[in-house]
Every structure is written in C-alpha cells, then in structure tokens.
Amino acid sequence: MDSGGPSTFAFQAEVKQLLHLMVHSLYSEREIFLRELISNASDANDRLRFESLARPEWGSTDPELRILVTVDPERRTLSVTDNGIGMSREEVIENLGTIARSGTGEFLEKLTGDQRKDAQLIGQFGVGFYSAFIVADEVTVLSRRADAPADRGVSWISDGRGEYRIETVERQQRGTTVQLKLKENAGEFLEPERLKALIRKYSDHIAFPVRLAGSGHEEETVNRAKALWARPRAEIKDDEYVEFYKALAHDADGPLIWSHNRVEGKREYTSLLYVPATAPFDLWNREAPKGVKLYVQRVFITDQAAQFLPLYLRFIRGVVDSTELALNVSRELLQQDEAIGAMRTALTRRVLDMLERLAEDSTKYATFWSQFGALLKEGLIEDLANRDRLAKLMRFNTTKTASDEQSRSLEQYLGDAKPDQDAIYFLVAESPTAARNSPHLEAFKERGIEVVLLTDRLDEWVMQHLTEHGGKPFKDVRRGMLELDAAKGAEPKAEKQDRERQALLKRVKQVLRERVDEVRVGGRLRQSAACLVLNEHDLGYQMRELLSAAGHKPPAAIPSLELNPEHALVRRLDAESDPARFERLALLLFEQAVLAEGRQLDDPAAFVARLNELLTDLGTQGAK
C-alpha cells in the first residue's frame, strides 16, 4: 500500500466508462446525485450505529448522528457531510477508484437509454457516488474512520476524467464530507429552496435529520427524520409509500402492492413489505444479495436479512424493525435467534396475503406473474406448509387460453371441468408452440377437455410435488395408458385394438428393438400416426436435462411407441410385405414421434435418407 503522501492513481477502466455514460447520458435526471449522496451518508451513519453496539467509544464523541448539506454560492460548492463510520485511506481507494467486478458488467449492459430508468440503476448497482460528476467539475472527499486518530484523515480529489489524487491529511471530525465544485450550468443546486424540495422529495424517510446550511441561511432540519415505517399508517399517504419504495429498491417504477403492519404482544416488530412491478437484474442468481432491511430497535443491522423470508420470495423488498431480537446479535448469529422462525412464518403469511389481494386485480396480477411467476413456483417445491395457498396463486397457459400468456388459475380449471372428469390433465413441453401442437392433445381437443400446458424450465420438477388440487389428482398426458372414451364395465377401445394388431406391434418392436420399451395401440391419437409415451415412473425430458446440466447422469428411461391404427401410414405399414420398406417406414414413424416431442434425433442424416427413399417410392408409384 502507498505511504500516505500525495499519490495519483488512474481509475479502473470500468469507472472511466461509467463516468462518461453518466455525464453524457443522464443530464436530464441530474438531480439524483443529491439522493445518492444523502443515501450514502445515511448508510455511513447506520454502520456507525451498528458498530457502536460492540465499540461504544466510536460514537461517544459527537453522538447525535446527522447529515449536513452546505452550500457556498461564492465558491460554487455544495457539500454533503455525515458523522458516520468514515473511511480509511485504503477504503477510499477501494470504494472510489474501483467498482465491484460482480456488478460492473451487468450495470453497463442494463443501461437502456431511458434516462429516468437508468438513473435508478445507478443506485441499484451501488455506483451512486459517481453521479456527482453529472453536476460537478471537481469532487473532493474528506474522510476519517471512527477508530482512526485525527492525523489519519484522507483527502480524495478528482475531475472525473481518468485520474484521482489521494493523500493523508489532518481531520478532526469523524465521518465523510463530499464537496462538489458545481458546473456553470448547475447553479440551481445552490438555491436553498431547490435543495429543500429535493431533500423532501428523495430523503424525507431518512432516519437521520438532514440539515441545510449556508448562503446566509440559518441551519435547519429539512426532512421529517423519522423512518416512514415507524409512523402510523393513517398518517402516511400512498405517494409517500411509493416514493419510499423507489428510494429503497432503486426502482423507477412504483410497487404493485405493499403491506405495512405492526405486531404487538409476545413478539413486537414492524414490517413494511413491497411487491415490485419489475424484476431486478439478478433475480435468478440464488446466491446474490437479497432480503429485507433489518433494524433492531431502530438500529440498522443489515440490508440482506434473507432469513425472514423463504428463498422463493426473494423478490420482496422492504423493512423489518424488531424490538424482540437481541441488540448484540451479529449478522452471522442472527439466523440462530429463536425468534427468527416465528417472524419468518408470519412474514411469509403476510406476503401471501398480499399476493391473494393482488390476484383480485387480474391486470396487476398478470404483470406480477410475468415477472415473478416462475419464481413463485419454487415455493411449491420448498414450502410444504403453504403449498395449497401457492397452488391457488399459480397461473397457467392451457388449451383454453387464446394466447400463450399464463393466465388460467386452477380454480378456473376445476370450475370448467367436465362433470365426469376425474383428473387435472397437464402436458410438459419445450415451448408453447410445441405444447399446442403436441399429438398427446388430440383426444382431449376432440372431447373438449382442458389441458394445462407447462413450458417453464422447472415445471416438470414442480409437478413432482404438486400432486393434487381440489380433490383431483394431476395426470401427465404423456404417461401410461390413456382411455378417455371407455364406458364403465366395457373393454377400452385401445385395448381391443391392441389385441387385434398384435402381429403389427411385434413387427415394429423387432425393428425398433431397444429404442422403445413397448409398441402398442393407445387412445391419445386422432390425426397423428404415432407418439412417444413415458412410463409412469420414468423421469421426463425436462428433468433429465436439469440433472445433466447439474453434472448428474440421469437414470435410463426408454419410452413406449403408441400407434394410431386408423391412420393411413399405420395401415400401410400393416399391409407392407417388403421387409426393407417395412423397416424404413417403422423407423420414420418413430423418428417423427421423437421430433413431435421437440427432441433431437440421434442421426438426422439417416432420417433424411429414409424420408427421401420413401418420397422416391411414392413418386415412382404415382408415375406408374
């Protein structure tokens, strides 16, 4: 590490790119710099308050935590000062000269060109400090850690063009000051009334007093300095809830719904939970930071309190403020606290209550489902206690939906079911198009029986856990024998045809050998000649791919081939006496069935050759 004297460093390459984008692409949203600097100051105060639990001496001098915004019109400077945790020289270099590698690429890829949305991404990716260069020709940072002596302060100065200068300086005050030398066209941010309006707009909920001083203006507290969630619900307007969410989640869009509750009695805590309208960039990274912000007796503990909600609800944003949890609990020990389990159960129930209310508005719920529906399905696997409630929240694409949108509920399915229907039928496929065109649906379409179409990556795994609903079992239309037309006490039509076609079935089995478990006649097909059928307990194609992707070898599973004896190709096959032509046609029927499943052929070239031979034969016969 450098000695402590004046040193000049070059910004990390990603920082240079980021600074260029901010200065040139976010001009119309430049006021957000103040939101970001005050938010950073609030975080620094929060961290000092937490560290002071174990080290009271850190906050013993100057114990009143606050944020001061100062303007000097003559020097054209605006400063944001906190008396929080502060930074060491090493931390300043690490925090202000580089961006965490994990978020840099994603941030740059997510930029849309929409200045309003991109301005929100700044905070979401933890790069809010750099927004200061949108309005400043030069930025100076003065800081001293709470545990450092006065002669170990640090000064950081940059014009944002590629380099920054850093040196160790004398600083009596704990905490950090960010001073901006404003550009000529940024004079509005020297006006007290403009700054008051911005502070109230973006930082009214900050739990520390935000004070404004300078320009002959007497120092005054501008914000309410009381956490929004700590106020009575009756006093809070909807737009206040929305603005708080936007600041909390760094989201340009408002939430779909929220729930604000105070629990009293044996366990006392307040929760304010939000359902976003759009998914965050790292939604599918189960290892990414997640969870609600946790406060204990108004003391900030962590903004990644994942213990309070199950993983499938990781999209929820919000705050939990408890008086129950021990104040000296560490972030690591928090998950061992016996009160956590009870709070997790109650908060999960609260979220499901919210989603049930949201489902009453089909338009809003469609928005929610398009963003988070696949995630909610994880709950069917992980949350046995709430599986029935979650099942009612599911939405599906079915043979009755006009588009490929997942909009049908299981309650709607059961309400429209045939009087004699004894199961909820479903089909797993690679895509909505493949599902709708599947030969497995032909008998169901003829009878007007609705089939749920499942095309999400986890659907087959989910259906191993969701086995019944409303007293009816789920049945996979790709598995086992299926006979929709059999009258009670009568021999199923497919079984009768199976007996009558035994000679044909044996001949086809001899050709296909180990490719299929069995060749039979079934009740599924009407227009198609053949289809593949899974055995009842074999893993489906989706599950096999998931296991393979995870590095596991799936157990062997050999499908059966089901033929439609009424189809012209099957009749021709039955009448074919030439062994070579019979083998070629039997293989073609099998390969067509594989393709209809959306699967890949082992030898596409051989399939093309057989198809060409068949077409040539047909052409020759037609010419005679």
Can you name each region flagged by the protein language model?
Residues 121, 139-163, 183-187, 193-624:
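GHKL/Bergerat-fold ATPase module in large chromosome/replication-associated machines
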Residues 1-189, 197, 418:
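GHKL (Bergerat-fold) ATPase N-terminal catalytic module, capturing the glycine-rich phosphate-binding loop
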